[in-house]
Amino acid sequence: MLYQGETLQLHWLDNGIAELVFNAPGSVNKLDTRTVASLGEALAVLEKQTELKGLLLRSTKAAFIVGADITEFLSLFAAPAEKLQEWLNFANAIFNRLEDLPVPTISAINGYALGGGCECILATDFRVASPDARIGLPETKLGIMPGFGGSVRLPRLLGNDSALEIIAAGKDVSAKDALKVGLVDAVVAPEKLVEAALKMLQQAIEGKLDWRAYRQPKLEPLKLSPIEAAMSFTTAKGMVMQTAGKHYPAPMTAVKTIEAAARLGRDEALKLETASFVPLARSKEARALVGIFLNDQFVKGQAKKLAKGIEAPKQAAVLGAGIMGGGIAYQSALKGVPVVMKDISDKSLTLGMNEAAKLLNKQLERGKLDGMKMAQVLSTIQPTLDYAGIERAQVIVEAVVENPKIKAAVLSEVEGLIGENTVLASNTSTIPINHLAKSLKRPQNFCGMHFFNPVHRMPLVEIIRGEQTSDSTIAAVVAYASRMGKTPIVVNDCPGFFVNRVLFPYFAGFSMLLRDGADFRQIDKVMEKQFGWPMGPAYLLDVVGIDTAHHAQAVMAAGFPERMGKDYRDAIDVMFDNQRFGQKNQLGFYRYSQDNKGKPRKDNDEQTDVLLAEVSQPRQTISDEEIIARMMIPMINEVVRCLEENIIASPAEADMALVYGIGFPPFHGGAFRYLDTLGTANYVELAQRYAHLGALYQVPAGLRAKAEHNESYYPVAAPLSDVSTGQPA
């Protein structure tokens, strides 16, 4: 043994070849600060070995290196700029030493080699991969860019266009595609991976492969003529502007950095990479996107804990077909849980089966599944007009019309036909679970399971715990949602649960702006282009359905009359009374027609202004800043109330529910991350300017208390102090 660290070892093989093995405690290797420092120590030992002829890098885990340890990022990024730069210089010097070893080097890559793992293998001369390998640089998805030489080495290895595509999009590629673009030199069976790597290394040692010729391009400027460079970078910038936009600066920064470094050798190019990385890492976008990654891990971990030891159901049932029921049945069947789909209407069953078939056809067209798999999935959806087969289901999801009497009747009826341990769940969006539970003899077996539309696309499922819901019921439904490929978040019961409870104050802010003379088109534009929502409120209401929103608004007003009740007609009432229900009947705030691909096309409709004049003051000029404040304050206040009332358990779960349920802009990180970025004291000061608008604008007591000391909702990361180890203070 030449070197033994906590996460890697270095020892001799035969014939002067050394092997550096990544073998961290736990299930995966990460290129954390400890491992980077350890790599430097191992190289220091290796550099003294006069008999060294070659070096092999490999992993003992199912993945080579999954990337950096993202749990360290917030501490690293909280460091002063000069400390972070010092740490990057320290790390890059280590990878340069790996690349500059006076012998050939090779990486044997199995599973994932992402982020820092990819940058590590780029520093070796050769790369051999098993067929299951996936290699890439996902940093831009976290609001940063490669920091260990990825933006320098990848373009010089692959050529500019292929490298820009991977880096700007944060992509990873399969072993097969990596071979095509020159990211790996060979793809071999897993059992022959090390053998093949050693064979290639031996060829390099014997001079049959010119390892210096493989290494040299990575040390030199990019081989591009001025015209080629202009074309390549102009195209890349255009694509980034189109896909990432102004709210996600990392992809454009990466492209511009690669462009600026194109005429430089490795060491000077690395200085530019570091100079670009530091401000990105310290940006609010990076904090938000890293926060989302960490919150996603936390939420998935919570789901695993809740469902520990519980098997997902082997058979499920959906009561109520149509678009929603068909979507739930499709998702269940697609993920391997057969489902009975029951409805009282043959027409609805046909609609539900057609919805499932349509979604499967799209998968077929995209090459995600073949005809046999499609037929198999469809065959596991059993449509029925009676309750045939319902007794086999371990979880039954009621998805009938959003009417408490009808839902209660359906739930009561099915309860009499099923076993004592069968779990019942209601896919309701607003009706309190405690209210529906009154119709049941076994309320402990009942909870809410709120899917979002369209079911196949929206990741969130709200699991609603009623007062009498048992832990085993929650565990079973969480296990089912996870099996369906969804992200379940458990909330406590109240009207609207969490997501709709906080969404309707946002719509109320919209209605009040219209009442005060704002233009709904300007509001949509500001909330989409400036704040970053995928849809502005008017457009979102049209997509949700004005009739659906009108009904839900009434439920919310009854549940929270002091804040959500109103004594005036608003824009939603006007649209509803004029049967302008949105996309479903082609008329809402906007007029809709079909484009040449059959998708809804949104156009302005002058009649909307005529109708809204009934409930609006004459048109007023309202600033973008005021629109954002008046739209967001009611939502944020309600989100905070939900945390204070224990409707939602943590800021992390609240923020992920908002991002996954209603598309809260990821670069803000969710409501609590947004609050922390603004500063609680600044937020309270802002909200007080609009306190005269009513109860929705009154800041909750807990938030006021935090604001007195400008406390944050998320823990403040301890900044990095020791650049030789990368450890926090």
UniProtKB/Swiss-Prot annotation:
Involved in the aerobic and anaerobic degradation of long-chain fatty acids via beta-oxidation cycle. Catalyzes the formation of 3-oxoacyl-CoA from enoyl-CoA via L-3-hydroxyacyl-CoA. It can also use D-3-hydroxyacyl-CoA and cis-3-enoyl-CoA as substrate. It comes from Serratia proteamaculans (strain 568). It catalyses: a (3S)-3-hydroxyacyl-CoA + NAD(+) = a 3-oxoacyl-CoA + NADH + H(+); a (3S)-3-hydroxyacyl-CoA = a (2E)-enoyl-CoA + H2O; a 4-saturated-(3S)-3-hydroxyacyl-CoA = a (3E)-enoyl-CoA + H2O; (3S)-3-hydroxybutanoyl-CoA = (3R)-3-hydroxybutanoyl-CoA. InterPro entries: 3-OHacyl-CoA_DH_CS, 3-OHacyl-CoA_DH_NAD-bd, 3HC_DH_C, 6-PGluconate_DH-like_C_sf, ClpP/crotonase-like_dom_sf, Enoyl-CoA_hyd/isom_CS, Enoyl-CoA_hydra/iso, FA_oxidation_alpha_subunit. One of its GO terms (molecular function) is long-chain-3-hydroxyacyl-CoA dehydrogenase activity. HAMAP family: FadB. The keyword Oxidoreductase applies. In the N-terminal section; belongs to the enoyl-CoA hydratase/isomerase family. In the C-terminal section; belongs to the 3-hydroxyacyl-CoA dehydrogenase family. NAD(+) binds at M324, D343, V400, V401, E402, K407, S429, N453. One of its GO terms (biological process) is fatty acid beta-oxidation. Its EC number is 4.2.1.17, 5.1.2.3, 5.3.3.8, 1.1.1.35. Pfam families: 3HCDH, 3HCDH_N, ECH_1. One of its GO terms (cellular component) is fatty acid beta-oxidation multienzyme complex. PANTHER family: TRIFUNCTIONAL ENZYME SUBUNIT ALPHA, TRIFUNCTIONAL ENZYME SUBUNIT ALPHA, MITOCHONDRIAL. Pathway: Lipid metabolism; fatty acid beta-oxidation. Substrate binds at D296, N500, Y660. Keywords: Fatty acid metabolism, Isomerase, Lipid degradation, Lipid metabolism, Lyase, Multifunctional enzyme, NAD, Oxidoreductase. This is Fatty acid oxidation complex subunit alpha. The lineage of its organism: Bacteria, Pseudomonadati, Pseudomonadota, Gammaproteobacteria, Enterobacterales. Residues 1-189 are annotated as: Enoyl-CoA hydratase/isomerase. The active site is at H450 (for 3-hydroxyacyl-coa dehydrogenase activity). The record marks E119, E139 as: Important for catalytic activity. Residues 311-729 are annotated as: 3-hydroxyacyl-CoA dehydrogenase. SUPFAM superfamilies: 6-phosphogluconate dehydrogenase C-terminal domain-like, ClpP/crotonase, NAD(P)-binding Rossmann-fold domains. Heterotetramer of two alpha chains (FadB) and two beta chains (FadA).
